[in-house]
């Protein structure tokens, strides 16, 4: 029986008790209430908020006449208003779409004076400031599609089968939203409003799930791996990892991504955009994470420390690669010869031995190399650079391996002093 209360809640503009209304419904009678005499003169009952819809008694002139006026029934000496059967029998599937509500609200705003009229439901919707003095407590007035007031606007809505007042702290309230609430009430839909953010729900389950997000609860779990999320959209996006669906495709190279944010970052490769700039040196980066890692060069911060040897790194991937030296793990294996490597870059260079690919070419002589490090060593022949210097004799070399061989000669020339024989002599 309570579900019918939302349908007749539009009678709230007229003073009648809720228990009496429910009793009428239980007896199978058509709900009705007494119409104040002021309403027959086109006035809303005193003290009723302009933002809340109320039924228009028949016979009152309005800018847009309807074909079938509301039926009035006399009881005793005073007139009584019968709730239209069409409103009572309306179902959820007849709910007016939001776009239609917005268009209807825009049509209402052309009225310059008098009560605002909802033609589809034969309801008045608020009044203008010209009639402010006749309404007693007046929270605001319609102007250009918005509800404006110097005080708090009060909007009456249905929450959990009860009538409450929701105070809008801001000075402006979108009248389209008021019309949307009005239509949902007439279509037997109950609103559940979140007190934290003001978001509305027409399903109690959705309302309860939403409130848990404010408490930090992760109520949406992945059925594949059990990972939980606070928001349903995040859970849906995560499940694409398991399904392999990549709906976001780059129009330049056709590469697809699971997340839209990854596509945006990828597109910066094509555009060359680097929106994240270092304040210390002015260097730009395409990703914010890259900027954060770069800034550690200036600050000297190395938050990732190896537990085996104590060596620290600026990036976590660098620490993971370093730890393979202690564990001996070689996760990257060549499919041609089965040789394993600690780093993917080493595997890529090794595979060029099988493919014969030499992408690094010397600009001076045209000689090509498998890896860039070999090209750099070769170019020192042309430049004459010798960065490796012997500490014993000062001789310099272009390659570190040649320096090591040279230092072994100095080691052979130096006699070994036996500390034990020296002690025996004394």
Curated annotation (Swiss-Prot):
GO cellular component, one term: nucleus
Zinc finger (C2H2-type): 192-214, 220-242, 248-270, 276-298, 304-326, 332-354, 360-382, 388-410
Location(s), subcellular: Nucleus
Limits of the KRAB domain: 1-44
Gene Ontology BP annotations: regulation of transcription by RNA polymerase II
Chief site of localization: nucleus
SMART domains documented for this protein: ZnF_C2H2
SUPFAM superfamilies referenced in this protein's UniProt entry, alphabetically: beta-beta-alpha zinc fingers (SSF57667)
Annotated disulfide bonds: none
Pfam families: zf-C2H2
Function: May be involved in transcriptional regulation.
Protein name, per record: Zinc finger protein 662
Species, as recorded: Homo sapiens
Lineage: Eukaryota, Metazoa, Chordata, Craniata, Vertebrata
């Amino acid at each position: 029986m309570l579900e019918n209360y939302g349908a007749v809640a539009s009678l709230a503009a007229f003073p009648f008790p809720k228990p009496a209304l429910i009793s009428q419904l239980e007896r199978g009678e058509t709900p009705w209430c007494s119409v104040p005499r002021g309403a027959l003169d086109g006035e809303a009952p005193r003290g009723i908020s302009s933002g809340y819809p109320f039924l228009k008694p028949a016979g009152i002139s309005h800018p847009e006449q309807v074909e079938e006026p509301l039926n009035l029934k006399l009881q005793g000496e005073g007139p009584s208003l019968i709730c239209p059967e069409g409103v009572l029998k309306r179902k959820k599937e007849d709910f007016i779409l939001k776009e239609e509500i917005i268009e209807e609200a825009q049509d209402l705003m052309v009225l310059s004076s008098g009560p605002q009229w909802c033609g589809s439901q034969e309801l008045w919707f608020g009044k203008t400031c010209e009639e402010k003095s006749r309404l007693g407590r007046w929270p605001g007035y319609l102007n250009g599609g918005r509800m404006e007031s110097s005080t708090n606007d009060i909007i009456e809505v249905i929450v959990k089968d009860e009538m409450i007042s929701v105070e809008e702290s801001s000075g402006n309230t979108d009248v389209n939203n008021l019309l949307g609430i009005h239509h949902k009430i007439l279509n037997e839909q109950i609103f559940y409003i979140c007190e934290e953010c003001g978001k509305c729900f027409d399903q109690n389950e959705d309302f309860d799930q939403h409130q848990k997000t404010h408490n930090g609860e992760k109520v949406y779990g992945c059925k594949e791996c059990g990972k939980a999320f606070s928001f349903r959209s995040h859970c849906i996006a995560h499940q694409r990892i398991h399904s392999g669906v990549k709906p976001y495709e780059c129009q330049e190279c056709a590469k697809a991504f699971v997340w839209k944010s990854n596509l945006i970052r990828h597109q910066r490769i094509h555009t060359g955009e680097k929106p994240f700039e270092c304040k210390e040196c002015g260097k730009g980066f395409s990703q914010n994470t890259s900027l954060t890692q770069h800034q550690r060069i200036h600050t000297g911060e190395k938050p990732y420390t190896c537990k085996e040897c104590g060596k620290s790194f600026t990036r976590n991937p660098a620490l993971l690669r370093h730890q393979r030296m202690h564990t001996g793990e070689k996760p990257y294996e060549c499919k041609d010869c089965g040789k394993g490597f600690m780093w993917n870059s080493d595997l890529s260079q090794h595979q060029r031995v099988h493919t014969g690919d030499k992408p690094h070419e010397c600009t001076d002589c045209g000689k090509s190399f498998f890896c860039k490090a070999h090209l750099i060593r070769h170019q020192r022949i042309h430049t004459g650079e010798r960065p490796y210097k012997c500490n014993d004799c000062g001789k310099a070399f272009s390659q570190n391996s040649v320096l090591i061989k040279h230092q072994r000669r100095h080691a052979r020339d130096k006699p070994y002093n036996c500390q034990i024989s020296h002690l025996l002599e004394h």
